[in-house]
Amino acid sequence: MRIGLVDVDGHNFPNLALMKLSAWHKCRGDTVEFADPAARRYDKVYMSKVFTFSRDCTDRYDCEVVRAGTGYRDYATILPEEIEHICPDYSLYGVKEAYGFLTRGCVNRCSWCVVPHKEGEVRAHADIEEFLDGHKHAVLLDNNVLASEWGLMQIEKIVRMGIRVDFNQGLDARRIARTPEIAALLARVKWIRFLRMAYDSRAMQDDVHKAIELLRKHGVPARRLFFYVLIRDDTEDALGRIRELKALGCQPFAQPYRDFEHEGKPSWEQWRLAYWCNRKPLFHSVDYEEYRKKRT
């Protein structure tokens, strides 16, 4: 069979589902490639979409086309077990690190997050060696690995193996703040670049400060602490959180709120604040009030 794959979001970040589908089909002797509607015919095409705001692919194929992913608001379709737990085909994107989940789900019920709707409660998913494939670096996509005993055991294993990792979706600062043993464990991890957390609301302030304090106490410098900062309607509140993190020596990254159930887009002010925060030369050289005056 000839299999075509379409990464609807683009190729800026490897699509894990497509890498697993590629590995499974290649094991069956099928030919797999990123689909080109002008180049050849396919027996089957898979289109995967992670983000609702990504423009859908309008290419037409004269074969069975499977569309799936959170970006299609499809929360029910999952990969069969034999595909879900296959080692991904990393050659598809030519990446140098492994990708995967140790756990799935989350214990939190954040109104802005799709994970509770799609995955439910946190649970064990895979051992790091299932998808490591000899790599010494791994990007882990867990949504709340610290809420899982299995997840904590896997982090211990990662430390023993000496693997460099990036928990790309962020770690829960509240669990770090309230469990000093977790802070001590994370300080033993080799990070690819940053230890990522989130500062989504002012209600998290005490926990965020405590997490930073504990991690610094165990030897993780503030400059290695990266925080996703959610920007909702109150941009002044988000600006305050961003400035707070900057003063502490941490790395804020602003994310304008998107309603995953509707088509609403972030406001101009949300975009402007995020642009200023995320362009680090600008962020470190110009105060936001000065920048805002120039961009009105």
Show where each model-derived region lies:
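Short, well-ordered alpha-helix to beta-strand connector turns
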Residues: 29, 41-43, 61-63, 96-98, ...
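Short, charged, surface-exposed secondary-structure boundary motifs
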Residues: 15, 43-45, 57, 74-82, ...
